[in-house]
Swiss-Prot record:
S-S bridge residues: none
Residues where uracil binds: I195, G200, D201, A202
Cofactor(s) in the UniProt record: Mg(2+)
Function statement: Catalyzes the conversion of uracil and 5-phospho-alpha-D-ribose 1-diphosphate (PRPP) to UMP and diphosphate.
Keyword Membrane: no
Keyword match Membrane: no
Positions that bind 5-phospho-alpha-D-ribose 1-diphosphate: R78, R103, D130, P131, M132, L133, A134, T135, G136, A137, T138, D201
GO molecular function terms noted in the UniProt entry: GTP binding; magnesium ion binding; uracil phosphoribosyltransferase activity
GO biological process terms on file: UMP salvage; uracil salvage
Biological or metabolic pathway of the protein: Pyrimidine metabolism; UMP biosynthesis via salvage pathway; UMP from uracil: step 1/1
Gene giving rise to this polypeptide: upp
Organism, as annotated: Renibacterium salmoninarum (strain ATCC 33209 / DSM 20767 / JCM 11484 / NBRC 15589 / NCIMB 2235)
Protein name per UniProt: Uracil phosphoribosyltransferase
């Protein structure tokens, strides 16, 4: 398993505005999309490509094209949906699947409540979108689910991560073809398993508090 923290001044700037509790939901959504596009640029460095023949207005030449089947993008519902536009802006030909997962606030374990994915992911590169890597429970189960369907490799794009969550993923998926791409690794988790300093509940800040 590989962990990559994207070091870029624009990433740091946008993340700072996201952290600010006074940033309203419309601005939060827009900045999330922009930040994800920056993270996706680094996350797709290992995307599979092949040589293709094309013809320019001047002559025939050889270029680069994405290998088929194209990558699969999987946002974790609901907060991961706020990252989807930023990802598909960079990979518009990618297919999109969905995993609905929620955290049990008592056990802190992840519960899968919905999925819309191909049954067979053999040979597919998968990009999982989940803004907060806190305890690691959600991504741990998502990665296990995708590998069970024979995904080739999995890259998880997160806005923030905590050392506890990264270690939990490493314990279960060490040696696996998994990459975690983040804007920042924060100090740790508080007693409610929220990332500190963090940015609060990403889903609530994207869409407002429901229920």
């Amino acid at each position: 398993m590989r962990v990559l923290v994207v070091d870029h001044p624009l990433v740091a700037h946008k993340l700072t505005v996201l952290r600010d509790k006074n940033t309203p939901s419309p601005v939060f959504r827009q900045l999330t999309e922009e930040l994800v596009t920056l993270l996706a640029y680094e996350a797709t460095r290992e995307v599979r490509v092949e040589e293709v023949s094309i013809e320019t207005p001047v002559t025939k030449t050889v270029g680069t094209g994405l290998v088929k089947p194209t990558p699969l993008v999987v946002p974790i519902l609901r907060a991961g949906l706020g990252m989807l536009e930023g990802m598909t802006r960079l990979l518009p030909t990618a297919e999109v699947g969905f995993l609905g997962m929620a955290r049990n606030e008592e056990t802190l374990e992840a519960i899968t409540y919905a999925e819309r994915l191909p049954e067979d992911l053999t040979g597919r590169q998968v990009y999982v979108l989940d803004p907060m890597l806190a305890t690691g429970a959600t991504l741990r189960e998502a990665i296990k689910f995708l590998f069970a369907r024979r995904a080739l490799d999995i890259t998880c794009i997160c806005l923030l991560g905590a050392p506890e969550g990264i270690e939990a993923l490493r314990e279960q998926h060490e040696g696996a073809n998994v990459t975690i791409v983040l804007a920042s690794i924060d100090e740790g988790l508080n007693e409610k398993a929220y990332i500190v300093p963090g940015l609060g509940d990403a889903g609530d800040r994207l869409y407002g508090v429901v229920g």
